[in-house]
Structure formats: C-alpha cells, structure tokens
Amino acid sequence: MEFSSKLLEKAVNEMAQLPGIGKRTALRLVLYLLKQPKDRTDFLAQSLLTMREGIIFCENCHNISDVAVCEICSNKNRNHQIVCVVEDVRDVMAIENTGQFRGVYHVLGGKISPIDGVGPSQLNISSLVEKVKSGSVSEIIFALSSTMEGDTTNFYIYKQIKDCEIITSSIARGISVGDELEYADEVTLGRSILNRIPFENSFKNN
C-alpha cells in the first residue's frame, strides 16, 4: 500500500495493530477521522488517554473499574458468596447482559496455555484460591470458554479448592465446544448459567 504522506502511513500502521483491523479498514478509519472536525478527533484522543490513565483493576475481582472496588463488588444487593470465574472483562459484560446472574465475579485475566507461555502464576488464580479458603465463598461457577485451555484452567483451579466445603459448578454446555463466551447469544448464555451443573459432572462427560 503506497502512501503520499508519512503521517498518514504511520496512523494507518498504528490503527492496523488493533484486533480485527486490517490495513484497508485502518485506512478507511483514518481517512474518516481526517474528515471530522478537529474538536471531535481531539475529544476521541483525550478520551483514549483518560481511559488508559484512569482505568484500574478492582482489588476484589480484577474487573476493570474507575475506583478501587468496582460497582459489582460494592453492590450490597449482589450475592457475594457466589463467585463466577471468567477469563476476562468481556465475559463479565456478556454475563451481565443476560440479567440472569446476581452473584459476583473473579476475572482470571486469561487462561492456562503452555503453548503461549501462560501458566497459573500469570493469572489471577492465587487470589481466587485465597478467597475460597477464607470461608467467604459458598459456590464457585466456572464460566470459561469450552476450549482445551479453558478446561485445563478450570480443572487446575478445581484441584486447588476441591477439599474446601463449597459447591463447584460449571455453566451448562449450551455453549458449543471451542466457542468463546462473549460470542454466545444472551438467551443461550443466560440459560447455561441458570442450568449450571456440578463441576465433577462436566469433566466426567468430556
């Protein structure tokens, strides 16, 4: 792709680093921004800077937040004894959109994947185990994607907490094997949470 401007080329190259954005799409987006009033592009740039500098991770669940404890964890109307374990913040948003879950979350920040060099120590697993062992949790719901990495992560955590006197469950397999949670429709995802099964059954049937 030939550019008549080095500044344009640099902007397109940076935009193309975003997930799912190729060079042609990046070019369209950059050219669109060039046609917008300067105050609009300034506002967009400032919003991104403010987000990057201001957003933090909740000290309880590792969800993104504007304050130390996120809105979900600080909500007294949620059941704090039921913890739904998810891979990342997109899964929290997907489950919240179903309106079927009133517990709290624990965001791992990924899943165990040796091929990608991601082990248990790179994830928020130890804080989850500590939370369970503190006695403040009555049920853990495993809601990671139905992939080999997701199942490996679920089983690793289960082994750490299986001797604790809590319920361990897994979302029902309405989510197709290999699918990421965020792509499931709200009805299917909502039902899979409501119809969750004992975790021991989930891996015995695999």
Curated annotation (Swiss-Prot):
Q: Where are the zinc fingers (C4-type)?
A: 58-73
> What job does the chain carry out?
May play a role in DNA repair. It seems to be involved in an RecBC-independent recombinational process of DNA repair. It may act with RecF and RecO.
- What is the official name of this protein in its record? Recombination protein RecR
Q: Has UniProt tagged this entry with the keyword Metal-binding?
A: yes
HAMAP family with a match to the protein in the record? RecR
Q: Which GO terms describe its biological process?
A: DNA recombination; DNA repair
In the record, the note on similarity to other proteins reads: Belongs to the RecR family.
- The protein's superkingdom reads Bacteria
Q: Name one GO molecular function term.
A: DNA binding
Sorted keywords for this record are: DNA damage, DNA recombination, DNA repair, Metal-binding, Zinc, Zinc-finger
* Residues covered by the Toprim domain: 81-176
Q: Does the keyword Membrane apply?
A: no
The organism encoding this protein is: Flavobacterium psychrophilum (strain ATCC 49511 / DSM 21280 / CIP 103535 / JIP02/86)
